[in-house]
Design a protein with these regions (language model features):
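Short pre-active-site segment immediately N-terminal to the catalytic Zn-binding motif
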Residues: 123-139
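Hydrophobic (often cysteine-bearing) scaffold residues that line and stabilize catalytic clefts
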Residues: 83, 136, 170, 174
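Post-HExxH zinc-binding segment in Zn-dependent metallohydrolases
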Residues: 10-12, 152, 158-207
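Pan-zinc metallopeptidase signature
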Residues: 196-249
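N-terminal low-structure segments adjacent to metalloprotease catalytic domains
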Residues: 1-78
């Protein structure tokens, strides 16, 4: 019998929120621009000094967010449960791998944050406030990452957790393949929606060939095992040019 994970929504604590914001303020990734997003959401952090405590600065806004959105956990659970089982089974079929038994429950933290970080070891990810369409998009996006990395463990036995985080090529690939996988026929039958990866990937050309056109073709015309190997090898072959163009350098 297939294991079908469930999502458990919760509110991020003040400390968890502070830790995420602290991480984003140190980030220099041109693809995500998470620092910019944090300063837009929290302009008061532009004046942050080494002596300041982020928790103290954001505490009032955190408390107001929790007070004003105390029904989000139940609302999100109701919205997502309509799709959970069908999606979990279909994405499992696509990757030709069962959800590992450790994935009984996946924690989803809700907070006043500008990003949606995921935690592979902890089997969790975080989100900010979203409408129904954004919520489903984000949950399907993040869950696709989890099973993609499980498939990579199977294909690449010498894997390590660092392979699944930025700036590794497998991390880049995990973000790019959101387009061909979530726009596949099986997923679209469950939720009709145009899924997109990060905008910057659509503008990358290698040897005068559009990156997304190349990757989409690979996933459309091959088994998932072959597609992952071929797309990863393609990025490795053009790694220097790919990274440079992704970072606008």
């Amino acid at each position: 019998m297939n294991n079908i994970p469930k999502l458990k929504f919760k509110y991020l604590t003040l400390e968890e929120t502070s830790d995420i914001l602290s991480w984003t303020l140190k980030d220099t990734d041109n693809i995500l621009s998470v620092k910019e997003g944090t300063l837009f959401l929290y302009p008061e952090l532009k004046r942050l000094t080494k002596e300041d405590n982020i928790k103290d600065i954001i505490q009032d806004r955190y408390n107001n967010f929790i007070k004003e959105n105390n029904n989000l956990r139940e609302e999100y659970t109701t919205i997502w449960n309509e799709y959970n089982d069908k999606y979990m089974l279909e994405i499992s079929n696509y990757f030709n791998i069962k959800w590992p038994k450790e994935y009984k429950e996946i924690s989803v933290g809700i907070g006043l944050i500008p990003v949606c970080p995921r935690y592979i070891k902890e089997k969790a990810f975080d989100i900010h406030k979203k409408n129904k369409e954004e919520l489903i998009d984000t949950c399907m996006h993040e869950l696709c990452h989890f099973l993609f990395f499980e498939k990579c463990k199977e294909i690449y036995p010498n894997w390590k957790y660092e392979d699944f985080d930025s700036p590794s090529l497998l991390w880049y690939l995990s973000e790019i393949i959101i387009d061909p996988i979530l726009n596949s026929d099986g997923i679209q039958k469950i939720y009709k929606h145009k899924f997109k990866c990060y905008d910057i990937f659509y503008n990358v050309e290698i040897d005068n060939i559009n990156l997304l056109d190349k990757i989409i073709s690979i996933y459309k015309n091959n088994s998932i095992e072959t597609a992952i190997k071929e797309s990863y090898n393609y990025l490795k072959e053009h790694e220097e040019e790919f990274i440079r163009k992704c970072n606008n350098k």
